Amino acid sequence: MKHFLTLRDFSKEEILSLVNHASELKKEPKKLLQDKTLAMIFEKNSTRTRMAFELAITELGGKALFLSSNDLQLSRGEPVKDTARVIGAMVDFVMMRVNKHETLLEFARYSKAPVINALSELYHPTQVLGDLFTIKEWNKMQNGIAKVAFIGDSNNMCNSWLIAAAILGFEISIAMPKNYKISPEIWEFAMKQALISGAKISLGHDKFEALKDKDVVITDTWVSMGEENEKERKIKEFEGFMIDEKAMSVANKDAILLHCLPAYRGYEVSEEIFEKHADVIFEEARNRLYVVKALLCFLDNQKGRE
């Protein structure tokens, strides 16, 4: 069964097809999933992700069932595989926002319904789908290739963007503090994919070098959910990595800024630059709705072929 746990499991053609279908659904909404049910399991808080998924299934003609971790017997020690067998047999799709990626993998092994990663500590693939759609809308893909800079933590967004760029053949430059590392296994995967796709990938510690000649600038919070106790240390380590006027001046003249939100002004991005690019950032957030619609339809079609 086809799940959506990471972009690694999808081909270039499949990813671009999702983006193109999202564009179609944005222009012309259709009820393509009449009476289908989506279970939404959250171990972490959510604003945009929950809204995108709940609205997506509803507007497609289905219904959503929200389940926080406190609602489930998982919180009392029931094995993930048992919960997966029950929920996966009752619904058409399962969306999960989890603390550990292993929870997703275990759930997917036993679920009869396709499982979607709506965020884990390793990957945030639905966000990157939304980013890709936004890049296309704002005409930042030239001949199918985008020039991207990612400035920030070696987190789920960095991992997912590295994988997407490697598969799609993009040019991506990543900048982060010297003591931060990308998972060797994820880096190795990206390098192998780059040999196939022709992607140009670089990793360094100078944000200005990474930003040169880029059309798309991406940043993210320095302190992810669950890292609140590390806030003081991380803010100190990321000093100098803010995206501000000087930083954006190094990128191409009409470069856009993307941020998955929530944004912490004065840290990863300045107030002035955030507001200057607010239109694209909030359209990026809205576009999650349409890529989720496309994803649900894709997974439903895959089930029909089994």
Which residues does each PLM region occupy?
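Active-site cofactor/substrate anionic-group-binding motifs, chiefly glycine-
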Residues: T37-L38, F42-M90
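Glycine-rich phosphate/diphosphate-binding loop of Rossmann-like nucleotide-binding domains
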Residues: E43-A56, K140-T219
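Anion-binding alpha/beta catalytic cores of soluble intermediary-metabolism enzymes, centered on
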Residues: D92-A164, H259
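Adenosine-phosphate binding glycine-rich loop
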Residues: D254-A255, L261-E306
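Short, structured coil segments at secondary-structure junctions
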Residues: L60, M90, Y110-K112, L168, ...
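Positively charged, low-complexity intrinsically disordered leader regions
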Residues: M1-M51, L55, Y123
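Rossmann-like adenosine-cofactor binding region
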Residues: K192-E272
